[in-house]
Every structure is written in structure tokens, then in C-alpha cells.
A protein has these predicted regions:
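Hydrophobic helix-and-loop "lid/oligomerization" segment in the mid-to-C-terminal part
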Residues: 2-61, 70-76, 158-285, 290-329
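Short, motif-level signal for alpha-helix interfacial/capping segments enriched in acidic residues
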Residues: 5-9, 85, 137-139
Length: 329
């Protein structure tokens, strides 16, 4: 059982530690990578020995960050996880599980955090883990350099859909302003993160939209990508992250579901909602989690079974919110 700690306690733990291993979640996104990069640079500034480990390869779109990857050259004495809500989200590669099982400190913003770490610094009100990691680093006595600022801005911007998602608050904008003042190259970062699409990404998007289906009086829209389609398009996994916003962006749709088949045949399902519909309610009942407007889960089996399982939970949530008659099957 984890012990919840405040920011000052987390700062004391980080300042008192050395030989620190920073863990990201699998299928890494901008927030987990941005946190890892910013924390690594902060620890380096304090003279600490630190490195980063992830179960999956970091997408090339984030290669502007200064990251030191763990190569086994030291024995970690302190393990910190960033933006990882549950032990299952670490993945199985690169010996990550053996380190994740002994996570000393988790820094996270998911309300669904399972409490796997010995101590957890949790801020579910933050739109991104990078949003409040900024204050952690400042309290560590580290100056926010342009390099650290770039990492933090990456996490804040990507987890808010470039400040479009409902999770964005005045505090989010203030954190973004602070990292801009510290030297984050916002113009270049936004262009790289949001305004560039590869040919492979466009091909994958076309395939996904060709699979579009509607359910529950068009309140729910579903798109799917099989592993064969992902492979044939040549698209990198990170390029598909913002694909999850497409079905929800359709006029009149309250729930958008994106199914992405993984190499092992299982499906990674992203849930995006609006209004009173809680995406986390849907995902949690399927063993996943996340936020009110953005959540996800993984389901084994064929696509039809995966669709049925998630759509059943969507139906219950729509009925709970009074958007669907109770007798609608």
C-alpha cells in the first residue's frame, strides 16, 4: 500500500537520493518522456547520477530532448516513476518489471493511480504530470533551463492536446507561461508536435476513418486499426497518439473510441468523451483507467469481442447520464 506524500517530502527524497533510475510508461507519450527528461536534467544539475529506462523505444519526434538511457552501468538505489498510473503500464521489455516492482516514488496526475509505489506524489487536478513537476524541480533548488523548459512544455502541451482538452485550467496556462519565460522554444515545439504529419500517418488515418462506425443513435463513434494496417502504413506508434481525438471530434458524438491492435494481437482502446460522460468510468470497469475526458484500457481477444466489451460499458455510461433509454440494448 502506497503512502501519499506532499511535494516537500518528494523533494527531500529526490535531493537525498543518488544512483536514481527514472521509469516511463510503455507506449511512451510526451508527458512521461517530458517528465523523465526534465527530472533527469534537474538531478544532473544537482550532481546526481541518474538515467532513464522505458520498455519501448522513444519516438523520434522527441529526439530533441537530452536523455541519458540506463545501460546497466550502475545499480539503482532509488527508483522514481513518472506519469505511470499502474504497474501494468510499465511494460515487459528491457528488464523494466524488476525495477518497477521496487518503485520508491511515483509522480503522477492520474486519479486512477493504483498505489503501487512505496510513496506517491499525486496531483489529479493537474492536466499533465509535467505541470506540477515544474514546482517539484523549482523546490529542488534547480534553475529551469531552456532544456528543462522544453521537456516540461512537451508534457504539458501534448497531454492537453495543445491546450484544447477540458483538463486544461488557468493553472495549466500559468505553468506553460513559466516554462516559456524560462526559454522553452514554443514555436518550434508546437510545429514539431502538432503541425507535421508524415505520409505514413496520413495513410494510417485514412485506413482508420474507413473503419468508422456509429452506435447508440450516433452518440458513439468507433475507429479501428489492425496491426497489419499499422505495419503496412509504416507509421510510428507515437504518430497515432492524436488519432484518438478524431472520432470524438465528429459533430454530435459524445464518446469516441479508437481501437489499435498491438503486436501480440491484443487491442489498446482509447476512450474520449464530452459533457457529463466519464471516460474513466468506462475504462476502469475494463481494467484500465485515466481521466474524466480521456482514458484507456487493453483487451485481449478478437476485435468483435473487444468492441462488444467496450460498447457494453459505453451503453451503461450513456444510460447513467440520461442520454440513452434504459431499455436500449
Amino acid at each position: 500500500m502506497t503512502e501519499s506524500v506532499d511535494r516537500q517530502t518528494a523533494v527531500l527524497r529526490l535531493r537525498g537520493a543518488d544512483d536514481i533510475l527514472i521509469l516511463c510508461h510503455k507506449n511512451p507519450d510526451g508527458d512521461t518522456i517530458g517528465c523523465a527528461g526534465a527530472l533527469y536534467l534537474a538531478l544532473k544539475a544537482l550532481g546526481k547520477n541518474a538515467a532513464i529506462l522505458c520498455s519501448d523505444t522513444i519516438p523520434k519526434m522527441y529526439d530533441y530532448m537530452e536523455l541519458r538511457w540506463f545501460d546497466g552501468s550502475f545499480n539503482p538505489a532509488f527508483v522514481v516513476a513518472v506519469d505511470v498510473a499502474s504497474i501494468q503500464l510499465f511494460g515487459e521489455n528491457n528488464n523494466v518489471p524488476q525495477y518497477a516492482a521496487h518503485t520508491n516514488l511515483c509522480i503522477d496526475h492520474h486519479a486512477s493511480n493504483s498505489g503501487y509505489a512505496y510513496e506517491t506524489l499525486l496531483d489529479p487536478g493537474a492536466a499533465a504530470a509535467c505541470e506540477f513537476l515544474l514546482d517539484v524541480i523549482v523546490d529542488m533548488g534547480v534553475t529551469i533551463t531552456p532544456q528543462i523548459a522544453n521537456c516540461l512544455y512537451t508534457g504539458i502541451a501534448t497531454d492537453t492536446g495543445c491546450f484544447k482538452f477540458a483538463s486544461t485550467t488557468p493553472r495549466t496556462h500559468m505553468a506553460a507561461a513559466r516554462v516559456m519565460e524560462a526559454g522553452a522554444d514554443v514555436e518550434k515545439l508546437n510545429a514539431r508536435l502538432f503541425e507535421s504529419r508524415s505520409h505514413a500517418r496520413i495513410t494510417a488515418e485514412r485506413m482508420a476513418m474507413e473503419s468508422l462506425e456509429y452506435y447508440f443513435n450516433d452518440l458513439c463513434a468507433v475507429i479501428c486499426l489492425t496491426w497489419d494496417q499499422i505495419e503496412s502504413s509504416g507509421v510510428a506508434g507515437a504518430e497515432l497518439e492524436d488519432l484518438t481525438s478524431l472520432p470524438r471530434s465528429i459533430e454530435g458524438v459524445e464518446v469516441g473510441l479508437t481501437y489499435r491492435q498491438q503486436r501480440d494481437g491484443s487491442f489498446r482502446i482509447s476512450v474520449r468523451t464530452s459533457g457529463s460522460i466519464d471516460a474513466c468510468n468506462i475504462a476502469r470497469r475494463l481494467g484500465g483507467g485515466g481521466h474524466t475526458r480521456a482514458a484507456g484500457c487493453e483487451i485481449s481477444g478478437n476485435l468483435d469481442n473487444a468492441k462488444h466489451a467496450v460498447l457494453e460499458e459505453v451503453r451503461k455510461e450513456l444510460q447513467r447520464c440520461g442520454l440513452l433509454d434504459q431499455d436500449t440494448g
